[in-house]
């Protein structure tokens, strides 16, 4: 097994992760990632797919697209495991109450990316991975600091 740390960008195709990918492509942040990985819910706006097609031409490292299936189809057809999208709730008077639990992020974004990272690192499902094998870059701005959390898997170090 190669002892070099695998470096990946979790590319959400938003401002932060796209900026990180482009800065890395120009050598402004290092090390050069081995891959960028985009988790496709198959329900993204058209401009996201257009952006991904463009940014892919700018990167010296592969952009890999993964999916757990269609979030839209799961919601509309009530698939076996319902992973609700981040819907906002409101009171009867129309005031915002908050977000429903964001289970879809785990099932449609995080899990497919982790599965691909395991594969790229050369590990099978449930196979033990040494601590610190992967560095995953996640684009989060300072106003979203509450989202910055350590990876639950010890084999992955998150970097923002």
Label each region the model flagged.
Residues 1-160:
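Nucleotide-activated chemistry modules centered on ATP-dependent adenylation/adenylyltransferase
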């Amino acid at each position: 097994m190669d002892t070099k740390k695998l470096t990946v960008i979790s590319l959400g195709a938003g401002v932060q992760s796209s900026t990180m990918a482009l800065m890395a492509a120009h050598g402004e942040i290092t090390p050069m990632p081995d891959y960028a990985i985009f988790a496709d819910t198959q329900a993204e706006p058209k401009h996201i797919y257009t952006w991904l097609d463009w940014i892919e031409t700018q990167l010296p490292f592969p952009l890999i697209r993964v999916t757990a299936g269609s979030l839209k189809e799961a919601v509309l057809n009530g698939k076996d495991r319902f992973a609700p999208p981040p819907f906002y709730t409101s009171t009867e008077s129309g005031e915002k109450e908050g977000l429903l639990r964001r289970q879809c992020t785990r099932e449609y974004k995080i899990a497919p990316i982790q599965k691909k990272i395991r594969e790229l690192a050369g590990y099978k499902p449930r196979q033990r991975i040494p601590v610190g094998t992967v560095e995953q870059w996640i684009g989060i701005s300072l106003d979203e600091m509450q989202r910055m959390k350590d990876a639950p898997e010890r084999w992955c170090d998150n970097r923002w």
